[in-house]
Curated annotation (Swiss-Prot):
TM spans (from-to): 24-40
Keyword Ion transport: no
Function: Confers resistance to heavy metal ions (e.g. cadmium (CdCl(2)) and copper (CuCl(2))) by chelating them at the plasma membrane of root cells, thus stopping their entry and reducing their accumulation.
Keyword Aminoacyl-tRNA synthetase appears in the UniProt entry: no
A Pfam short name: CYSTM
Gene Ontology MF: a single term: metal ion binding
UniProt KW keywords: Cell membrane, Cell wall, Membrane, Metal-binding, Secreted, Stress response, Transmembrane, Transmembrane helix
InterPro entries: CYSTM1_HM_Tolerance (IPR051671), CYSTM_dom (IPR028144)
Compartments, record wording: Cell membrane; Secreted, Cell wall
Name of the protein in question: Protein CADMIUM TOLERANCE 1
Leader sequence residues: none
Protein family (similarity comment): Belongs to the CYSTM1 family.
Membrane topology classification: Single-pass membrane protein
Organism: Miscanthus sinensis
Length: 55
């Protein structure tokens, strides 16, 4: 699949941004929503992504 970053860890926001760039906004929003659904909380990144899709 994807190689892990070698020198630094990718943050959650960076990961969502990468998905947005590679697959588009809708895919990034679904990815973010499913991630928050799995951890049972809404994070700031989820809200930013949803606002991005609604704009």
């Amino acid at each position: 699949m994807y190689n892990a970053p070698s020198a630094q860890e990718m943050s959650y926001s960076d990961h969502v941004q990468r998905r947005h760039e590679e697959k588009g906004c809708l895919y990034a929003c679904v990815f973010t929503a499913l991630c928050c659904f799995c951890c049972y909380e809404t994070c700031e990144c989820c809200l930013d992504c949803l606002c991005c899709c609604c704009s």
